[in-house]
């Protein structure tokens, strides 16, 4: 179910588009000046390097801006955002979290708008600091952040904001002959997630020059990070007007021209079908809607924290140095303000860490509780997020009781157990799912405790929404698997099930149309000895889908398969089955639902 934050995003759209006739810049007869030289780093600023070699860490203002927690926004919605509050959080970040790798202080939406959301622009259609929120302007704020050895981040919505258009006569900085009429489409078509801006027309050279002028302004101010929001395809918008790939490309080009290494993060709920574009032109991309609940706390488990368990797997393969899958803020620092149980807070932080998401908190850093500090500063957990280990993915298809894993370069495995159910439950990580049998040494990452040696599996009783995080080091033996192709003529297809082409599949074919009674039965699955087997299922599924798995006509187990990136990408999970010595059947049944397409199964040779 989609997060209830979406209607609140709509309310923000109303705020963004309210009073469109106010604060519109008049045409300014200004002679364009030469572009400034690349901005030098302020004293105390971290050394420049290529952005996003690791998932970034820091703080964002939006979680507190968007919350109705008592006292956070005393002057109306989103009023938390002020120079005083930003610098207070920067001071707390430097004192408490900087030594653990947190370094970005990111100013989100509204820095150019007053408490009634009336905007400020300079004489060149660029956002300007609201004097009530940021009386000294934005450069002194960045300078103060740099003086603490931190990096400064800022925010913009994509497109030319409607209020900045000024009848089309506003001159573009350092672009002789260009006005706002020359940067947009002549029909003033709108764009972004709120339709609060006119879409830029990059077939017109002035559009790139407008982006260049904004990027140079941020570089001159000393900003190190830009969040570009409302980007599509995504942000709950589709169609040509909301395709902002050209905007993101223009921003990448403009940032490069400034000579300043500015991290470009794009948002929100971006379309995975354009992931190649996001990777090419940006350093990070929000894969989902806001994590905030827009309620009396910062977040809630059901709002959208739990959505990430469904949405993150299909993006995992795309994360790499230079660009990361952004799951949004980690609001785990103060239980009362966050609105989560301790178990939920640990699961939240665990998923973000193993998924290699940027780690940026939206909490009030001056009010962190002891448990929140322990979550945000656990060096072993941070090392998983910041190290060379690839993002973890689910290795089992088991619904609310999930096992995620990533194999480390030293042969060990990062393994997370999650119970997403509303009641307590046991969760088991079976070594077969990790590719070996026998013994393994298990270390509890959160508690920094060696738990000893476990044979074949580890099982933990977890509370509702609880988790455990382990490093599992095999001491047993690896094994081979015997593969059985779905399209084999020895199999039995029932209902609508049919064989289709699949270029990514192992045999270039798959079995699909497994819906509403469609079944695929693998025949003559041979094992030497009877017992419990974790069978690999390679499948294709553009969204998370259920299926029922059974062997030899026995009772079926209902399972849920995580989404793959699209309907052309193959992923693999393991499913538990009981087999007898000799020949067996394994059946994948859609039941009354829609199941994934199947490439093949692979059975351990034990």
List the predicted regions and their residue ranges.
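Extracytoplasmic
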Residues: 425, 434-442, 450, 456-606
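Glycan-recognition and catalytic regions of carbohydrate-active enzymes
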Residues: 356-421, 496-508, 512-513, 523
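Carbohydrate-binding surface patches
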Residues: 346, 352-355, 360-362, 397-436, ...
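Glycan-recognition surfaces
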Residues: 182-189, 197, 201-203, 213, ...
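Secretory targeting and sorting signals
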Residues: 1-36, 40
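N-terminal module-boundary/linker segments of secreted carbohydrate-active enzymes
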Residues: 39-83, 266
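Aromatic-lined carbohydrate-recognition surfaces of secreted/lumenal glycan-active proteins
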Residues: 150-165, 252, 256-273
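Aromatic-lined carbohydrate-binding/catalytic grooves of carbohydrate-active enzymes
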Residues: 64-73, 81, 89-144, 148-238
